[in-house]
Amino acid sequence: DTVCSIAMTLVSVSESILKALEKRFLESGHPSNLTLLHSCGQSDRKDGIQHFAHEGMVTRIIGSHWGLQPRWMDMIAKNQVDAYCLPQGQIAQLYHSMACGLPGKMAKVGLGTFIDPRIEGGKMNERTKRLPDIVDIIKYKDEEYMFYNQIPIDVCIIRGTECDEMGNLTTTEEAMKLEVLPAVMAAKRYGGRVIAQVKRVVQTGSLNPKEVTVPGVFIDDIVVCENPLEEHRQTSSWYFDPSYCGQARVPQENIPAASFNERKFIARRGAMELYHGAVVNLGTGIPNDMVGRVCNEEGISDDIMITVESGIYGGVQAGGIDFGIGQNLYAMIGHHEQMDYYNGAGVDITYMGIGELGEDGSVNSTKMGVRCTGAGGFIDITQNAKKVVFLGTFTAGGAKYKFENRKLEILQEGKIRKMVRQVAQLSFNGPMARKKGQEVMVVTERAVFQLVKDGVELIEIAPGIDLQTQILDKMDFKPIISKNLRVMDERLFVQDGPFGLKLKEK
């Protein structure tokens, strides 16, 4: 059977149901040999779909992101499960295509990346490489497209705030809308079963029909959570906060500024690329954890529109294990609907994390050694954004820094080089980006690069950094060095309060 779970991080995770299924497997060996299908990563490193991470319980996983799911990353690395990675938005939209009765979904997203069946086909370990592709290349009017094949769903697990006695389900206290209804409809198309976890059951007729996310006719089973403080939390870090679901607003000054460190320094430099009216996406890591807080501290949040793949607009974003939600939002739409925008028109600027930068401008953010975090929404967003700004430290693995007297000092160099001749996995295709005319930048704590016609160009260096010994000698390839190589703006080193960010004009 194929089981589909709808959530993101620990937001909207049906914890009671997942725990009960794990308990049953450990006691009886059933259910077993499942395929687990999920668009978003669904854990906080401990709970969520980690409950399914047992050899024999799941024999195939099809998902987008496992960065907060160490047990899944371990099982995939050890070849204990068949593992396919597909772009998060494509899975979310595939639910809609399947619900419509279509055999799959056609898209440009994924071409030229490790999802492309001519490269890796999204197969994340050796055992999966021997298996059939679940994506194809097709041609329509002489243009190439990816085709994401249907994945029939037997059981769909969802979560809501409450159901009435007819089963009509609302999600009013959830911090995201997600793609609940398309997934439910997809399951119904194949005769599948829908199981919903809720906090409470209310009298029929007491719900506002406009707030019903799933009509009761589509729900087969309702599980009322008996321990909501532990198993129906709004997100991992707290049980419920009305400011994260639009039921309250908090004063802007009550939202704390981020502490100054290399991550904030990098985010500040990245934010200098913003302009009035820009529609922006923030990916996981430094972008989501820091860029929004920098914008709030600088007082420019209302002059741009920050979005996150979950479907939120505006506000100040939570970070880390609470990725995808925010306070003081202006709007919230479905996850699959957000991906319509990201895949179609595309945002003006996206900020993304970076694992490796290759000589041709390609980027790996999905697999480091045998450790596969997966793509998440990275490919959906970066392939269609007008400008892509990658944010990350120059090296990884234990680097330590000192910011003093408006200079940067490297106290301890990272053990892992991130500037490599060829990336280990093709998450972002540099040559394709150049061909499309995308603007691409890479911002680190000591250097700023941009993608140009002939490769990767170094355009800025931090004060206090030696070009040869601390940049060029730490790279596996030699970048083009700009004739107008600049020193990074000294204002970035201001440690207390705003640094004076001024937005560009478009």
Residue ranges and their predicted role:
Residues 32, 256-259, 264, 268-275, ...:
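Glycine-rich phosphate/ribose-binding loops and adjacent secondary-structure elements
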Residues 1, 31-34, 59, 277-278:
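Nucleotide donor/acceptor-binding cores
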Residues 275, 491, 505-506:
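Non-catalytic interaction surface on structured domains
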Residues 498-506:
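Long, compositionally biased
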Residues 1-4, 245-256:
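Generic N-terminal amphipathic, Lys/Arg-enriched alpha-helix
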Residues 3-24, 40, 280-293, 297:
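Glycine-rich N-terminal segment of FAD-binding domains in flavoprotein oxidoreductases
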Residues 27-30, 77, 300:
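Short, structurally constrained coil/turn elements
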Residues 9-25, 35-37, 42-52, 57-251, ...:
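Conserved phosphate- and dinucleotide-binding cores of soluble alpha/beta proteins
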